[in-house]
Amino acid sequence: ADGKTYTLSSDAGDLAIKVYSNQNYNIALEDNNGEWVAVAERNLSGDGTLHVEYDFNDGFPRMAKICLTATSANLSDTIYLKQKGVKTPTFKLAKPNMTVHGYGGEVRAELDMNVDIKDLHISVDYTSDEAAMTVLDKEDGWVRDITYENGFLIIQTDPNPDERAVRTATVNLVYIDGWEVENKQQLFLMQANAKDELGVEVSFIDVRNLGDTDGMKVTDDIYITGYVVSDRNSGNVGDNIQTTQNSIDYTIAQKTAYIESLDGRYGFCIETPTVDDNTFSRYSKVQILLKGTKVILQEDPERYTISGVTASMVMSSTEGTASDLPVKEKYMRDLTDEDIYTYVTLKDCELPVRKGSLTPINEGYANAGGAHRCAKYATLMRDINGNSMYIYTNTPCLYRRDGTRLPYGSGNM
């Protein structure tokens, strides 16, 4: 055929598909639910044309297949007809994290959804060694039943018998749309212990005191509260490492977040095991359970990283804006190690070299040219007092070369 995939509008119409062959072949329709596609021909010999008619689609996007089979030559080919719909599938959790009382009971998670819950594949992962399987098959799991009613996912949970330990579970919701594209939402549940306690809140300084250069593993149920000050979508979080002369690990930035204390005094670098575990949204106020993580001290300058933070360890997350963050303005000379990984406005700064972009590099050596020889670029910045520092910009950064002229004059950074 002269095309393998055809994308059709939601309106009814017809389509002529050229087929090139030197064989006799049969034509059959598959996955034609509702018989919305009709093909005039059932068999052809040699080059020919398929005359296809399709109906108006007042529902969700759908797909049918035209299968061509030349039995004598043991050859086959498939043509995909993807039709848009008047309706667009909606499938989005309002919040990815929820806490559960130690005594169990009902949990209600807001879910914006216009598809039938029967079309979802629902499974639950537990943090223990138990294998994940569907809710209906998992009779010994503490997540008992999941239904959907009036815009809410309703989850029934058992009490937690352990008087000390909290426990976590991940509810996986998977919807396969009419074009066979997988859409996945995950709800991370954290259940308090039998005393209905989620652990003890500790300060950032308490956690800093735990850290050492080899990494200290946290064994107690403790948690911190802070503001997320990094933007996971910017591509400019974390230091992507050049692993070889021609390769860079770009996932480091995707697995890194920065969080500061509520007063803005201290900050941590958060490292997640996978990209999917980095669910942190900029300016949101979060609570993170630290049990099972490592607190790592890095020296010269002194800074702290919390590694091994999974999405299920986020106890709560409340969306915010930049105005929610504590105001902290300084000159470069006033910066200390405590300011690392916090949100600071640097006063009266300028870029002494204003030509080009934030990354005035030969793109043939960077990711844009597929060469992966340059991970970042350092732009010089100075302030009114004569102090200077470099701004590091990763090559995957979305705004590093967007056509915007570098700012003239001086101002806040």
Language-model segment annotations:
Residues V86-G105, M190-M413:
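OB-fold nucleic-acid-binding modules
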